[in-house]
Every structure is written in C-alpha cells, then in structure tokens.
Amino acid sequence: MSLKSKLSLSAVVGTALVLVPAMALAQDGAASNKYDANSWLAVAAGFAIGIAALGGTMGQGRAAAAALEGISRNPGAAARIQTPMILGLALIESLVLLSWVIAFFLQGKIAP
C-alpha cells in the first residue's frame, strides 16, 4: 500500500470518526425535523459525485499510464492496446455518469 493511499484512507477514516459520534449523540427532537433528512440527502448526493469523480479519474489515469507504458515498450502492439484501453476508459466513465444520475435522483427527492 503506497503512502498516498494510506494518507487517503486515514483521511476518510478520520473524517468518519469525527462525524459519527456527533450523529450518534444527537438529540431525539432533532430527528423529527423534516429538513434534517433533506440536508443529508444533499450531502449524500455531493459525496456521490465527488467520490465517483475521484475514483474515475484515478482509474482512467492508471489505465492510460499502463497502456502508454505497454505501447512504449512495444510500439508494434499499439493498435492492439489502444482499442481495449478506449473500451476500458469508456466503461470507467460510464460508472462516473451512473453516479451522476443517482445523485441527480437523490436531489429530486429533496422537498423544497
């Protein structure tokens, strides 16, 4: 596990450790507020887009780097490497777009 992934994981875990106790110790009266669920839906939609964009860009970057490394080692195989790389990039991008659609539907559940 690289240092960058360890730092990313510790940032996510640290954020969860800070936010979870505050939600667990919330008052009972605040749970009946109708705007509370709507605000968490908006936060969830924002996190969905952010995490999907982060994962998609990391996946696309690694796929492109591996394909370019393969082409640089064997330039004759460029045609055989390029087509699966483009297909893989399209599938990665479709997952990001799917998360965008889900976030859009979550925004539609928020009552004004």
Swiss-Prot record:
Membrane-crossing segments per the record: 39-59, 86-106
Subcellular location(s) per record: Cell inner membrane
Site feature location: Reversibly protonated during proton transport: 93
Record has Cell inner membrane as a keyword: yes
Binding partners and assembly: F-type ATPases have 2 components, F(1) - the catalytic core - and F(0) - the membrane proton channel. F(1) has five subunits: alpha(3), beta(3), gamma(1), delta(1), epsilon(1). F(0) has three main subunits: a(1), b(2) and c(10-14). The alpha and beta chains form an alternating ring which encloses part of the gamma chain. F(1) is attached to F(0) by a central stalk formed by the gamma and epsilon chains, while a peripheral stalk is formed by the delta and b chains.
Family: Belongs to the ATPase C chain family.
Protein known as: ATP synthase subunit c
